[in-house]
A protein has these predicted regions:
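N-terminal beta-rich core of secreted/periplasmic extracellular enzymes
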Residues: 26-198
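Ligand-recognition surfaces built from glycine- and aromatic
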Residues: 1-25
């Protein structure tokens, strides 16, 4: 009989159910759960406007990737109004620090902005693409490359990366085939594990 394991993260509206008895949850926070943390979050949410809550769900693209005239994307006004939850594909420790300082100085709610980037095959040190790495079957080298990318990107102020891409490529016309490990499910799962461990 299939076992049902329930992991309650003590958030009223989120429940995660894992049906596979062999599934292990890794990367759990070692921080203790405290009533003070619950009170802090509930108090913060009660003071936020609907607009600010929606803003925390908004992800903007960094200015460096835009062409043409300045738009509403990632404007100082959005930051000051607390409407930027995260920013994708913006780099450089100084740039990230400047944006975060502006956010903490001018926004009413003072929730730090999360910075993310597509770190698919390295950050400053560029490695072969994931599809090319998968051809090697060298899981130790793939794990080392992921670890180096994680160290470099976190040192630059990035909080999370949009990697690894673990989709199994079944159609060569798909534009993101090169970001994954190919069409083999066994190899793809082993490479995904190596990248996450890295």
């Amino acid at each position: 009989a299939e076992e049902l394991q329930q992991f309650d993260f003590d958030i009223d509206w989120i429940r995660v159910y894992v049906r596979d008895p062999h599934t292990r949850i890794v990367g759990n926070s070692k921080l203790p759960h405290t009533p003070e943390a619950d009170s802090f979050v509930k108090d913060l949410l009660s003071r936020m406007t609907v607009e600010e809550k929606i803003g925390q769900l908004s992800q903007y693209v960094g200015r460096t990737l835009l062409t043409g005239p300045e738009s509403e994307y990632l404007s100082d006004s959005l930051i000051a109004r607390g409407l930027v939850g995260s920013v994708l594909n913006i780099s450089g420790a100084k740039t990230l620090r400047d944006l975060q300082e502006k956010n903490m100085r001018y926004s009413r709610i003072k929730i730090p902005i999360l910075f993310g980037m597509d770190v698919i095959h390295g950050y400053k040190t560029i490695f072969p693409t994931p599809l090319a790495e998968s051809c090697s079957w060298d899981l130790a080298a793939i794990e080392r490359a992921a670890k180096i990318a994680a160290i470099e990107s976190s040192a630059a102020g990035l909080h999370w990366t949009f990697a690894p891409m673990v989709d199994i490529a079944r159609d060569a016309r798909w534009g993101r085939v090169v970001e994954g490990a190919g069409e083999d499910t066994y190899l793809g799962s082993e490479i995904a594990k190596a990248r996450v461990n890295g």
